[in-house]
Amino acid sequence: MVMRTRPLAAMAVRSCFSALTGTVYLLLVLCEVSWAQIFSFPFQRPETCDLNQYFDISALSCAPCGANQRRDALGTSCICLPGYHMISNNGGPSIICKKCPENMKGVTKDGWDCISCPNGLTAEGKCHCPSGHILVERNVSGSLLSQATCELCDGNENSFTKPNALGTRCVRCEPTFVNTSRSCSCSEPHISTGGLCFSNTGNFPQRLISTERYGELGMSSNSEWFTKYLQATAAACWTHSNLTSCQALGNMCVMNMNSYDSTTFDACRLFHYVFEGAAGLTGVHSVPFWRQNLPWLFYGDQPGLASQVLSTTPLPTNFSFKGQNQLKFVAASYDIRGNFIRWQTVKGGVLQLCPDTERRLDAAYSFGTTYQQNCEISLSKLLADFPSPVFYDIYLEYTDEVQHHYLWAIPVLNLNLQHNKLFVNQDSSSSKWLLTRRIFLVDAVSGRENDLGNQPRVIRVATQISLSIRLVPNTKNGNIYTPLLTIAYSDIDIKNAYSQSVKISFSVKYEMNQGDAFVQTDIALGVLGGLAVLSSLLKTAGWKRRIGSPMIDLQTVMKFLLYYAGDLANVFFIITVGTGLYWLIFFKAQKSVSVLLPMPVQEERFVTYVGCAFAMKALQFLHKLISQITIDIFFIDWERPKGKVLKAVEGEGGVRSATVPVSIWRTYFVANEWNEIQTVRKINPLFQVLTTLFFLEVVGFKNLALMDPSSSLSRSLSDYAAPYSRILRYAVATTIWLVIGIVQVVFFAAFYERFIEDKIRQFVDLCSMSNVSVFLLSHRCFGYYIHGRSVHGHADTNMEDMNMNLRREAENLCSQRGLVPNTDGQTFQIAVSSQMRQHYDRIHETLTRRNGPARLLSSSGSTLEQSIKAYHAMNKFLGSFIDHVHKEMDYFIKDKLLLEKILGMEFMEPLEKSIFYNDESHSFSSVLYYGNEATLLIFDLLFFCVVDLACQNFVLASFLTYLQQEIFRFIRNTVGQKNLATKTLVDERFLI
């Protein structure tokens, strides 16, 4: 019985445990669901709450007010209903209200007590008093009266009081009321405006324009600010010389874009009216445009005055890149009512609407740093940050030799200014400009209509601010003229401030007179261009001699233009590289500033020169490429049959003696080697591109192209990055590219070719070992000859004989390889006679009559036989020509004169005999990539720079440069291979 009970008990325990586990798991799941739900709640705003609800700033939702309560004006707490007073107030909504008794229905202004009101109640349940009276609820000691009283303020002489704005006490009337009407009222015939009282007996204009003009939008707005305060401000400034009123009047003129129209009495016309009326007063700080008690708004409207202000007097201080390199701009700031706020430095983004770190914002005032800042800001942010405009008078602070501090006024060029309805400041001639002084950034007040508490209909924003600093010509100490602040405003018609935005830009640019630099560049271009013409004429004359044509025809003119394009490309390249290095070295290395970088507009001529250099170099490159893939070439096989063999004759059933055929494989082998060296270069193109990119992007040489004085290769991410100068980018890129290219060429010539591999000389050796010579004509009567005739008589031999022949050569047991006995000269430049060329062409016509050798196997037997006969005929003719067999087409060998080598032309004309010029420099490489490395290197460099100047991206430029290198290499290989197969009868299928 006991044994049976224990299992049942155990089963019961397990069942209970399982149920408990399931319950706990379910609770956890429900808790997780509950926790997930509390992360989301309804979105409510204070204005969506009901009248009997307030907005709980903790729960961010609407909550009900207590009994006899309603929400306050802000909507974040509760107040008692009219007729109820507070008996408890713990702040916010925690109040308790109690109804006032019937005999005391009024509530005191503080809301804590009930009081009897003899003159009735207001809508809020407070006591009401007639006009000119103040409400008295307590006696002098502060005790509450049983009944409120209304006391009349004494407006008579000796008192001149009236209720204050709250109606709680009597205050003295505004002085203009007392002075004008000897009372606190301003009745006819006096004029009351803007809370002031003026007499109408003066000569102040009555017809005022309170309309704000928005030229960009083509509309006008009836500004409530101007309606309320323009006349009063102008009158107070005119009649009383009130300082703040005069400042406020000046602010209104600035808000109206400093525009002047002689036919309307707007803010600026009123300011000029007051300004002219103060002509008898002394000028402030000896400035004729700054009258006493008035702000300095204008420089005057005399023609040419702007040019004098900006270009006549240098600042009495100097700047450098190493010491005093900060522009200390300060601003006198005023509020819209004309009150002086404070002196403040413009650092920290005072004039910059775009947000950024203080370090980057302040970089705008580092001397020599070209600054550019752009952003897009929502109108809602501008309205929130600038509810009222702040006005600035900008000055440059400097110290003299004895460390006394002075201010230099900064003129403003307002592009929105209209003078008699003309935008004079948008004219290209500075003689027509009208300079001003005061600026603001955002005006959200003048665009308010009917009520100053309304959202403005139009907002005016300074969307473009540019500070121009010009260097004094020929200065050595960093002297500058007066900086110019150019500002342009945009008028935005507000539809939805949260969805609308405006683009803002702030820039600081430096300029100097580039006339001398342009003149020097033009002189260099003229001199070098003249030398290029002379060089092209010599090349054309040499070409005419090499083609054996004395006539000047259209082909000659075209050839001259092609040569001139190549030489002129070199001229432009030299000038642009020299110009770029000049700016890079002199700008970055100077301490006392004497030069400043050209501005982007001034760089256009330089960019044009680079474009011309690239276009002409591309034309030269294509000219050379086409010349290389159309050369005439033939491989002369000197191998002779070694004997005769018996050969079966088809169709005759017998045998006969036949010459042992010479193997064609040696010719195929030489042809393949020639095909391989067609695009061999003295540099590695991929290494060139990658190394250049490494130094520019990784090492940081591209930072030298920034338009700032720093020469550091590394920049912190927290630092401001100035825009790039296209001239400096070009200078840095060309310098690095040329240095890497020259280092590669020197390494290739001094080390690689000496100790590892020299493909050009190896090819000449291969020709000798293969018993094959190369006859090459790059022009009709000019070309190259590689003498490959074996000194051993035969090259088609076994390994043992080949090694023995090499040993005999090494031990000088045989004759030398040269064409002339007992010499080593194997390479020659050849100038062939016209007779020899004609004979060559007759044989060559038979050789190339078919459409290339690629279809040898599919050709008919007769055609193949004719081609083979033509090949043997050409081989026999050229071999006999080299062996002086044809006396009528003989040749002689000589050395070229030094002047001939320098000019690249031949003075002697091969009339009767051809001329072989000894050529130890292997100049036959000029028909290969190898001999045109300078052209290829400069072409690749110019391609790289043109792409970078277009897109400002070294990575993209590197990729596209390598891509074009590979494309042209493929074209050169493919077409050159087809030409080789066509001219030599080597089947293209054997060129691997």
From Swiss-Prot:
Stored Pfam families: Meckelin
- In the record, where are the intramembrane regions found? 668-676, 677-685, 686-698, 729-754, 755-759, 760-768, 924-926, 927-933, 934-949
Pull the Cytoplasmic topological domain ranges from the record. 546-555, 629-667, 769-923, 983-992
- Keywords in alphabetical order, please: Cell membrane, Cell projection, Cilium, Cilium biogenesis/degradation, Cytoplasm, Cytoskeleton, Disease variant, Disulfide bond, Endoplasmic reticulum, Glycoprotein, Membrane, Signal, Transmembrane, Transmembrane helix
Biological processes per GO annotation: branching morphogenesis of an epithelial tube; cilium assembly; determination of left/right symmetry; epithelial tube branching involved in lung morphogenesis; ERAD pathway; head development; heart development; kidney development
GO MF terms on file? filamin binding; misfolded protein binding; unfolded protein binding
This one is known as Meckelin
State the encoding gene: Tmem67
